Amino acid sequence: MDVNPTLLFLKVPAQNAISTTFPYTGDPPYSHGTGTGYTMDTVNRTHQYSEKGKWTTNTETGAPQLNPIDGPLPEDNEPSGYAQTDCVLEAMAFLEESHPGIFENSCLETMEVIQQTRVDKLTQGRQTYDWTLNRNQPAATALANTIEVFRSNGLTANESGRLIDFLKDVIESMDKEEMEITTHFQRKRRVRDNMTKKMVTQRTIGKKKQRLNKRSYLIRALTLNTMTKDAERGKLKRRAIATPGMQIRGFVYFVETLARSICEKLEQSGLPVGGNEKKAKLANVVRKMMTNSQDTELSFTITGDNTKWNENQNPRMFLAMITYITRNQPEWFRNVLSIAPIMFSNKMARLGKGYMFESKSMKLRTQIPAEMLASIDLKYFNESTRKKIEKIRPLLIDGTVSLSPGMMMGMFNMLSTVLGVSILNLGQKKYTKTTYWWDGLQSSDDFALILNAPNHEGIQAGVDRFYRTCKLVGINMSKKKSYINRTGTFEFTSFFYRYGFVANFSMELPSFGVSGINESADMSIGVTVIKNNMINNDLGPATAQMALQLFIKDYRYTYRCHRGDTQIQTRRSFELKKLWEQTRSKAGLLVSDGGPNLYNIRNLHIPEVCLKWELMDEDYQGRLCNPLNPFVSHKEIESVNNAVVMPAHGPAKSMEYDAVATTHSWIPKRNRSILNTSQRGILEDEQMYQKCCNLFEKFFPSSSYRRPVGISSMVEAMVSRARIDARIDFESGRIKKEEFAEIMKICSTIEELRRQK
């Protein structure tokens, strides 16, 4: 029978049909090879937008720098970065006038955070530029290396464990005439193997000391490493993103803390909240504009797009904003916050790996590192690359490029949002002093502008006024990419608004399915995704039930764990059938052991082990939850884990799921090949670091402690905590006298060992 597809939508309101327009099946594109070209594009574009600025030379590093601030006012619609200081300051003043006390209160909150933040805050985050090794490392390792180098150079304020003291060391390090660092290198030598008597290559890891003079150290401290942004859909060209080093990160964190605190108090800000909270906040602004417009008024909404937001922002402007926001605050506080924008005004971008050349005829490949781009003959390059290199050469210093204007992606999201909101704030009637007025939403570079006016001419005038006001602070609304609609239909940060926010369930489709971590985590993540979509994305009960059945099917095929009584033959079916036959209570078997699925849409919030615990045979319970099971290398047992789920659009989201550790929570062993490389020492450091942190977290579960602000080592803190806990447990009868005595003895032994050390 032929079905007329339009019949499917007869009962569906038009806005719900958005889920049928889903374009993102298949894998997103990933980048291969070097990011050097993309980084050069970014640098060249940024300088082009600011080309009418003033050139100066940095006295410390010798880097040429372009300063577009207070440059010529724009005469055309081309994007430009010539922000006017007095306009930015005035926008800040009006923002404060509309929100009395907002800056004052946020400063007080930030000061409290600064006093309490521990240096381990910097271990969060993934790849970080490690200036000691001149390449990317996991954040924890990069921090450990930095602190190690600081201490060996006599900088010891960081030993208190407070982030602010570590930052004191950073500032002091910049005044030192030289810094001594340790670098890793590999030695290969041929030796005879005793067993096989064959010659083998033996690799040993050497460490050598290297001295950096003041200039070289400063260049490294101000360097952002660049990579290509992966998995970006809907783009033909890739683009570069930056990862800053440890010297910059701490200062940026405090600036963003202040800006976040301000954003929380601004109703037009789409940051730092997300999800349903964000939708509610935005719906409020729309409602306000609708109710305040008179019946005769027109109301239009612009779904806005800005041209190259980051590349037209300027750190000097952020410095002006911070100077204004903190104007009545103590000197130390103002200094700490102004360092991040100053460092960004003097930043250097690392060009990455360089170019790879290959000769088809001679089957030769050779890498041209970024350091060589300054001197190499350009005849080897094609025309577009040649142009890029010519443009960039005056800015090159040791394989890094001086990049004073522009911000690089994702560095000051909160602070740039404050700037955007300050322009939206100027749309009130008392500031426009005419018949049109505006309000809107801002989230980093994304915005929606709601304009009310008595007639179309008023709307047009309002758009023009908004556009020009933005230009004055270095924001370039793109007239080509923004579109205007009657209020009631617009898009903002991938939320579609049509008389209320529409649930675009198809955006979540890529996160359905089996994640491939391990049997235990995959089951938990799978049902949590379905549960979350029922809560947040209008996933109806029938569809959810179907999604669940498809997921279980997918899961069984992935792990070859079809029910014990099935006819399907796989590698595992022999073992699973045997287990099925010898199990009395078959309902108690986990799905991954060939058991039945007991999930339905009512019990998705219960981990499978808990759901089936009462139904399990006793010996099965014993095998399943046995920490001594020799076949399993256990993950640390946490009650909640974090999974990374990929929506179709926007950044990967972190999602919490319940983790019950069983023999199914295995982790694959690490690839051995890393153990023979120069990375090995780093890997061991990282594991030790991880173990210490895990141990510490065991003593201070995050629910029960505010991190110690006093100056005590991790060991001292854990010992004192153990003593307190033991006493409480002993007095309440939870532990016996002998156990209490044993704990006290262990604590004393640890202290004794520390004293001897």
Curated annotation (Swiss-Prot):
EC number per UniProt: 2.7.7.48
Catalytic reactions on record: RNA(n) + a ribonucleoside 5'-triphosphate = RNA(n+1) + diphosphate
Keyword Hydrolase attached: no
Keyword Protease tagged: no
Enzyme class of the recorded protein, top EC level: transferase
GO molecular function: nucleotide binding; RNA binding; RNA-directed RNA polymerase activity
Superkingdom classification of source: Viruses
Localization per record: Host nucleus; Host cytoplasm
Motif (Nuclear localization signal): 187-195, 203-216
Annotated segments matching region Disordered: 50-82
Quaternary data: Influenza RNA polymerase is composed of three subunits: PB1, PB2 and PA. Interacts (via N-terminus) with PA (via C-terminus). Interacts (via C-terminus) with PB2 (via N-terminus); this interaction is essential for transcription initiation.
Protein name: RNA-directed RNA polymerase catalytic subunit
Native source organism of the sequence: Influenza A virus (strain A/Japan/305/1957 H2N2)
